[in-house]
Amino acid sequence: MRTAQVADDDLSYLTYYADNIAAFTDRREAEDGENGFDKTVPLDSVFNILNGNHEKKHYAMQVLDPNAGINYPTDHPVSMDEHFYKTVIQNITECLRGIELDEKYLNSLLSVLEANLSYIPSSTSKKELTDISLYDHVKMTAAIAACTEQFLEEKQEKNYRKHLFENAKQSYEEKMFLLYSMDISGIQNFIYTVGESGVLKGLRARSFYLEIMMEHVVDELLEKLALSRANLIYTGGGHCYMLLPNTKDVKNAIADYEKELNAWMMQQFDTALYVASGYAPASANELRDEPEGSYSGLYLKISKMIAGKKAHRYDAAMIRALNKKRHSGDRECKVCRRMAELADDKCEMCNALEKMSGNVLYDPYFTVVRRKEKNALPLPGEKYLVADTKESLLKRMQQDGYVRSYTCLLYTSPSPR
């Protein structure tokens, strides 16, 4: 970049800066490292050095394939070859031909990269550990770049060369980022609220519904913040972590969204489910744990913020609204025990969950739509969840009410397609 003939506000400076930070966080020297590079080195398991381990397990050359089974780490020799890399390049090239390079296809692009780069090491240096995939490195680079751009935009700073390249060391101390977390309370009680018959089906449907709901909540928030799933670090079990820009607009948006979610939760489930979120401002140096202990300190700050909200769930206005709430029926659902209009002694929600329990086993796609349909499950933001086959999904994607879809073909945790 030092000799590059590009404008001071060129986005390449953002990419260069973000790539350096991502490299700080995922590249560490090996104890017995040597000089040079080895393009045949496979991706090592992250568990090789966990808890003092000294293992040498690594992954086979593979792209993500639902028919190939799980690629478990192995002790057997693995050597990456030119043919595999050419196959990966060809796969990505062919997929890119069918993708428009705009914000609507960002998550599709991420899925393509995940499928092809998940078992390729981000570094082939003999001096470094090779347990971080190229996909994770690229994804983190994109997240950091997006955060940095929004942070500098709020400061009306357009000279990327000066701020991120010439003054890079100083910028590593700026708290450009928010490490953000969201947690749903009450999920265990919700999952185990099942009827006397069809217990396993009920458990499966309720667990799946909460997982899809969390994925939907994450996607809705990222859309509000003009970010992509590159900024999502983890989601599962009613919990998520994201890397967000440290701006006033973002802080206001996540506060408003939390209130919106809890109002919806109260309307749908009374006090059974509650959302609490927290965040900690972070610098690039803190993300790579400089000084030592600063990274874990971020999580401690987040946990304290979330714990404080859980201890004081509702403000006076929400408590008054809860006390004034009128139920639509005068009979008690035999499953969830809430007052509602019933069909077969069950409320609309429990009937829809019962129907969804069969869809979870046999339908590969689950779609978020804007219009309510029969047996559709409600989602925050006046959206609904329905099950689809491949054929019905293709038809639905041409309709105005289509929002997004999730599939479990490749992953335990649904990813948008």
Regions from the PLM with identified roles:
Residues Q5-R417:
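Regulatory and interdomain segments flanking nucleotide-handling catalytic cores
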Residues M1:
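An active-site-proximal "capping" alpha-helix that borders the catalytic cofactor pocket
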